[in-house]
Amino acid sequence: MHARRSLLKFVAAAIGLSLAGGASVALAQAKLKVAAVYTVPVEQQWVSRIHKALNAAKDRGEIEYVFSEKVANADYERVMREFAEKGNQLIVGESFAVEAAARKVAKDYPKTAFRMGSSGKPQAPNFAVFDNYIQEPAYLTGMIAGGMTKSNRIGMVGGYPIPEVNRLMHAFMAGAKEVNPKVEFTVTFIGSWFDPPKAKEAAFAMIEKGADVLYAERFGVSDAAKERGKFAIGNVIDTQREYPNTVVASALWNMEPTIDRALKAVKGNAFKAEDYGQYSLMKYKGSELAPLGTFASKVPADLVARVKAKEKDILDGKFKVAVVETEPKSTAK
């Protein structure tokens, strides 16, 4: 009888250990449920960087990732709520045009983490914000543009004159002015985040007025530059592969540092309302100057040296790019 009880205890213990082990494995393999809401197609520059970082986390097996793209502003709140109701632990998106609605949803789902591109401040307890703080590489690309223009006229095509766009344009202009004080700018906003034909037409108009370098804040600008044999400077992504003889340099935005920090916070039950914007700075590897690639031998060596020296000063904390968020104005006559 004693032997039988001992055997039963042994079996029970073994089963308990097995179950505990299984639970541990299941816990270790548990993936965060992440959803994203995008107002534009995922191939659009800005959103593509978020999409890329989230897909990387998905490929590593860290998250389950679902998203909705081309969501109209009027539908944004509804889509956010649907994702929250489905138990997604982190919801990512861009709330620039739907700020009030997005914050209302976050308030209604306090146990869900929200990390939204926003011009506003964080909202306790669960609405964190982020932004593409890539003014540092934008300054460096401006230096290159200022050194490459022959006409001393640079055209700049943007989506909307919001702080997130304005600061990049001002940084670019300041970089160009450092290298070439004579340079003048023509600035146009097309009133859309994704309208390549309209951006292209705006760029053509600038070329007609003498611009030989174009700042491509929107898709479509590089197409105009290519067709007219002019140079383009990329923003957020590097499209030199598609435009090998047109895109001289690009300011790259890397969303991985921002996304990875948010995922870590949610996993550790430490997510809170904070501003993730700083993780887009070069020191966090959140942004960088793209390799010159096909233009490595075409950009003057002395200009490359100046840019590299400035890049080092930025990384060493010896030079700080000014953040100017007012609407940039044309200076060309």
Please describe what each predicted stretch is.
Residues 4-12:
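N-terminal export leaders
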Residues 22-28:
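Sec/Tat signal peptide C-region and signal peptidase I cleavage site
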Residues 33-60, 66-76, 96, 161-167:
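Extracytoplasmic "Venus flytrap"
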Residues 36, 88-95, 115-117, 209-219, ...:
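Periplasmic-binding protein-like
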Residues 54, 140-183, 187, 275-299:
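An alpha-beta-alpha
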Residues 107-132, 236-246:
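Flexible loop/hinge segments that line or gate small-molecule binding clefts
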Residues 122-144, 156-161, 244-257:
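Short beta-strand elements at the ligand-binding edges of bilobed clamshell
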Residues 267-333:
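Hinge/cleft segment of the Venus flytrap/periplasmic-binding protein
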